[in-house]
Amino acid sequence: MPDREIVGERLRKLRGSRTLGEVASALGVTTMAVSLWERGERMPTDDMKVKIAAFYKRTVTSIFFKE
């Protein structure tokens, strides 16, 4: 199981200068969902992991499972 805090930090870094709202809108979720992922309080569903990876032009493994 991936460490939520590590994944959250990766997601924050990938977001860069984009706002939570910009990312949420692109993914079709709420800003709260993105915030919860980035704070390591929740993990996205497997389907959402695929969308996130595509949005950031990365692989699911590199974001959610790579050590």
Locations of regions flagged by a protein language model:
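Short alpha-helical DNA-recognition segment
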Residues: 17-36
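Key DNA-contact positions within bacterial/archaeal DNA-binding proteins
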Residues: 31-35, 42, 61
